[in-house]
């Protein structure tokens, strides 16, 4: 895991990640603007843009497309899955988060993990 692309306002995302001691695990942390969260613009209309921004920053040259073949979006809502699709990324839904398995499948997640262990197996071993 190298990047976070969250619909939460970026300052809050950074605080949450820091609180749990994961700051050093990520090269890039992107979130929405404070006003976007208040209008729900980020979760509905900007998720794809936030993902694209994170990929551009992660690439080091602003070229998000250069990472497309080496990137997977892991998310717990339909917005995450739809944002991945908008960026031509494969996606894994995590049903132990905010959204349900049904929501993730209906949004088009290629795979859904019910537990952290399931996610680990999917990512490291290619298991379903």
Describe every region a protein language model picked out.
Residues 3, 10-72, 78-86, 101:
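Substrate-recognition "cap/lid" segment bordering the active-site pocket of phosphatases
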Residues 3-5, 92:
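Structural detector of well-ordered beta-strand residues that form the stable sheet scaffold
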Residues 6, 31, 125-128:
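N-terminal processing/targeting junctions
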Residues 7, 33, 95-97, 116:
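Short secondary-structure boundary segments
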Residues 21-31, 103-123:
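Structural recognition of alpha->loop->beta junctions
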Residues 61, 120-128:
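Generic C-terminal helix-cap and adjacent flexible tail
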Residues 73-113:
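Acidic, Mg2+-coordinating phosphoryl-transfer loop and its flanking beta/alpha structural elements
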């Amino acid at each position: 895991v190298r990047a976070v692309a969250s619909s939460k306002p970026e300052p809050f995302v950074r605080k949450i990640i820091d609180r749990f001691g994961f700051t050093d695990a990520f090269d890039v942390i992107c979130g929405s603007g404070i006003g976007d969260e208040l209008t729900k613009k980020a979760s509905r209309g900007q998720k794809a843009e936030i993902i694209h921004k994170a990929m551009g920053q992660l690439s080091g040259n602003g070229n998000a497309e250069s990472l497309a073949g080496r990137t997977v979006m892991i998310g717990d809502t339909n917005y995450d899955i739809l944002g991945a699709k908008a960026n031509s990324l494969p996606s894994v839904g995590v049903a132990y988060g905010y959204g349900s398995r049904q929501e993730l499948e209906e949004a088009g997640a290629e795979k859904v993990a019910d537990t952290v262990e399931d996610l680990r197996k999917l990512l490291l071993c290619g298991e379903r």
